Amino acid sequence: MARCRRHSRSRSRSRNQCQRRRRRRYNRRRTYRRSRRHSRRRRGRRRGCSRRRYSRRGRRRY
């Protein structure tokens, strides 16, 4: 997630702050575990942040 945030910084700063604020709500351990689980899928994707493309409900929208 940290890597994701770094890419989005150049696009829009206000949105980046919003994401940072939202991150505090989650447990750090929980986000770490989740990112480890999905790391294999993310490695193949080169363009920016996967969170921006896919919403939580619809993964195959794009």
Swiss-Prot record:
Described purpose of this protein according to its UniProt entry: Protamines substitute for histones in the chromatin of sperm during the haploid phase of spermatogenesis. They compact sperm DNA into a highly condensed, stable and inactive complex.
Similarity comment text for this entry: Belongs to the protamine P1 family.
Molecular function, one GO term: DNA binding
GO cellular component assignments: nucleosome; nucleus
Gene Ontology process terms (BP): cell differentiation; chromosome condensation; spermatogenesis
Record's protein name: Sperm protamine P1
Main location: nucleus
Locations listed in the record: Nucleus; Chromosome
Expression sites (tissue/organ): Testis.
Keyword Lyase set for record: no
Coiled-coil regions listed in the entry: none
Positions of region (Disordered): 1-62
Assigned keywords, A-Z: Chromosome, Developmental protein, Differentiation, DNA condensation, DNA-binding, Nucleosome core, Nucleus, Spermatogenesis
